[in-house]
A protein has these predicted regions:
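Acidic, surface-exposed loops and disordered segments
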Residues: 8-200
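Bacterial N-terminal signal peptides
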Residues: 1-5
């Protein structure tokens, strides 16, 4: 069967949509990386716990510095808990439009909150690697995802929301990931290969 991988045929200094070329052997990892899109519109159908467990296991098997595993992960798939957290965030951010706070999770039925250990300087990198594993493994299982930064700002202003998530003392949210079944099919966006060079 054929697979798809990045083509180097186009000029390096031009932005372009990811190009694909047919190869003889199927490579599911490359296919997943090239096919994944950020999803911002979801069906109401929840992601079952068994599927989530597999996705999360892939996440914590990400590379990380000295195997410190300098992350904590909280998963919210209960609509009532999600509404509670949104309420805390809205109250703690009175200068923000409530609709913006309400919509910051893109109505994803499952939310993952990733916190880092600020005492370890490579912890943000570790959390990024964990998050990428989560999003790629989710896509391979038919689950869409979106990486979100705005909710982190709202969370950090809300002691009640932070307490509800139950992170250990000192850990700070750094990434939020929405997951669910896609209700849209986004087009690939251009990537700038001019930012990548071999040093001769």
């Amino acid at each position: 069967m054929a697979c798809f991988c990045l083509s180097a045929a186009a000029a390096c200094n031009q932005q372009q949509k990811p190009q694909i070329m047919e190869t003889k052997a199927k490579n599911e990892v490359i296919e997943t990386i090239m096919a994944r899109r950020s999803i911002r519109k979801y069906k109401a159908e929840p992601v079952d716990r068994q599927t989530m467990q597999q996705i999360l296991e892939c996440g914590i098997n990400a590379p990380n510095g000295m195997n410190k595993q300098s992350w904590e992960v909280r998963v919210v798939d209960n609509p009532e808990v999600m509404a509670e957290i949104k309420g805390y965030m809205t109250s703690a951010n009175p200068d923000m439009d409530p609709a913006m706070v309400e919509g910051c999770f893109r109505d994803a039925p499952t939310m993952i909150f990733v916190a880092n250990d600020p005492s370890y300087d490579c912890s943000p990198v570790d959390c990024g690697l964990l998050s990428q594993n989560i999003m790629l493994s989710a896509w391979s299982l038919g689950v869409g995802s979106v990486c979100l930064g705005s909710p982190v700002r709202f969370l950090l202003n809300s002691p009640e929301a932070m307490a509800r998530l139950g992170f250990s003392e000192g850990y700070r949210p750094i990434i939020c990931i929405g997951l669910g079944y896609a209700d849209e099919t986004p087009e690939a966006k251009p990537r700038d290969m001019g930012k990548v060079r071999f040093v001769e």
